[in-house]
């Protein structure tokens, strides 16, 4: 159980001034928060850990050489290009 003194002490540590009404409000809120921790204490801990809720399947394919665009074709629709390369905006000055 959280006491009013605990609330005032916490407020003092935080360097804030609170009224009696605020202290009572915070006391109730602190108790609610601590109740949530009590609920967490009841969670089973001896379960096998999972990394994902849904099963994941990697989809791999073999690398196969194929036809690719010529440089001129790849750059043909580029709005900004320079010396045979795509030109993007500067990100570091």
From Swiss-Prot:
GO molecular function: asparaginyl-tRNA synthase (glutamine-hydrolyzing) activity; ATP binding; glutaminyl-tRNA synthase (glutamine-hydrolyzing) activity
Pfam family, one: GatC
Catalytic activity: L-glutamyl-tRNA(Gln) + L-glutamine + ATP + H2O = L-glutaminyl-tRNA(Gln) + L-glutamate + ADP + phosphate + H(+); L-aspartyl-tRNA(Asn) + L-glutamine + ATP + H2O = L-asparaginyl-tRNA(Asn) + L-glutamate + ADP + phosphate + 2 H(+)
GO biological process: glutaminyl-tRNAGln biosynthesis via transamidation; regulation of translational fidelity; translation
Documented EC number(s): 6.3.5.-
Enzyme class: ligase
Keywords for this protein: ATP-binding, Ligase, Nucleotide-binding, Protein biosynthesis
Nucleotide-binding found in the keyword field: yes
UniProt key word ATP-binding: yes
Function: Allows the formation of correctly charged Asn-tRNA(Asn) or Gln-tRNA(Gln) through the transamidation of misacylated Asp-tRNA(Asn) or Glu-tRNA(Gln) in organisms which lack either or both of asparaginyl-tRNA or glutaminyl-tRNA synthetases. The reaction takes place in the presence of glutamine and ATP through an activated phospho-Asp-tRNA(Asn) or phospho-Glu-tRNA(Gln).
Quaternary structure and interacting proteins, as annotated: Heterotrimer of A, B and C subunits.
Similarity field: Belongs to the GatC family.
HAMAP family assigned: GatC
Protein name: Glutamyl-tRNA(Gln) amidotransferase subunit C
Record organism: Archaeoglobus fulgidus (strain ATCC 49558 / DSM 4304 / JCM 9628 / NBRC 100126 / VC-16)
Source species taxonomy: Archaea, Methanobacteriati, Methanobacteriota, Archaeoglobi, Archaeoglobales
